[in-house]
Amino acid sequence: MTDPPRARWCESFLCRLRGLTFRPSLTRDEGLLLVFGRDSRVDSSIHMLGVKFDLAVFWINNNLQVVDKVVARAGKPAYMSKEPARYVLEVHASRIEDLAIGQTIHFQNA
């Protein structure tokens, strides 16, 4: 990503459950990083209930490698990664080409 988004760290169950639900919009420089205890397909699945806009979603494993990505549509109820992931990065839909499957990333505390 050339201009990385400022993603909010979201580790608690309630934070992950709520996600971006009921937000009116998301700017290109905002995001949410859902953090789970281990790599898992089931645990890292997401829902789009109450989300009013499309998202670029990246699933990232414990080795910080992107293992799947999708444009999540506001009208579809749920998405699951094809591979186990520990992190789910939700950002503006226009950023779907910012990361490639297989790419290794790093998190920066700002």
Positions of the model-derived regions?
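Compact, glycine-rich, soluble single-domain proteins
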Residues: M1-A110
